Amino acid sequence: TKSRSNYAIKNNQVALSDSQIKKNLDTKIITTRQDSQKAATAKYKAAAESSKYTLTSPYVKVNPYGTSPLSALVTFKTSNNVKVTYTVVGKTAKTSITNTVKGGYTTSHQVPVVGLYADTTNTVKITATTKAGKTQTKTLKLKTSALPKYIKNATITTKNVDKTKMAIGKNKLTVINRTTKQPFAIDADGAVRWYDTNYSQHTIEQWSNGHIMILSKKNQNSDVYNDLIETDYLGRVYKEYGFANKTSSTDGGVETTVIHHDLVELPNHNFLATVSDGSKYKEDTL
């Protein structure tokens, strides 16, 4: 019978030594994305420390790192120590997203706003609260662009929605990570409230520090997903791992994506990944 593959079947070894596996994986920490963001990060930090920006007139940047169009960064200073909470007002019942900024009471504020609607002038409320309980609120209007076609055309169906029984109804979103294209998140009524413009494959995990790990690729035209990115929901990249394309299995042909389907954080914050190691079999090595 004819093979259904378009490539020659290889005769890889059944088992490899640890040293050969490490050589095949060729894991490296790279800084391409971090380096490209340094100027923006410095700009936002300076804005948060500048007396030019206040709660009544803050610095606002939608999509601050160019990869998270339904997020925004709001920065300002206050004369007193305050804690800050934001609310993205929902379009339907119990879909408003409210979060309090980590860091407690301070005078310099960088507020990561997540959960905007696409192609909408969103209403966002920023509330500063003093230790004595005095509050001040600023209402912002943040305009976003339309969804990209691969998300816009995705079929999202909700039925029998009972928000009283759903954690999603308490300021949380459900992340949808498909075989390819952009990962996105929806609220209890199925509205898209976050997405990342980086293409992702199978793997997107929440880390204990609030960051997310996304298996992506250098650009949308690349064949393989061999960039593992530690990022946040605003799109800032904190660490990036690169892998070699030397691990295709016997039946894998040109498929040289290293990590497949799973990634887990350990208590010491190292992580384990399921990978193909270049042996006869695939997706069977941690």
Regions found by a protein language model. Give the residues of each.
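Proline/serine/threonine-rich low-complexity linkers at boundaries of modular beta-sandwich domains
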Residues: 35-55
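Histidine-/acidic-rich catalytic cores in large beta-rich domains
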Residues: 12-13, 20, 24-33, 37, ...
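A near-ubiquitous, low-amplitude feature marking generic local secondary-structure context
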Residues: 59, 96-99
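Short beta-strand segments within Ig-like beta-sandwich modules, predominantly Fibronectin type-III
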Residues: 99-107
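N-terminal mature-domain "stem" immediately C-terminal to a signal peptide or N-terminal signal-anchor/transmembrane
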Residues: 5-7
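Gram-positive cell-envelope targeting signals
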Residues: 1-3
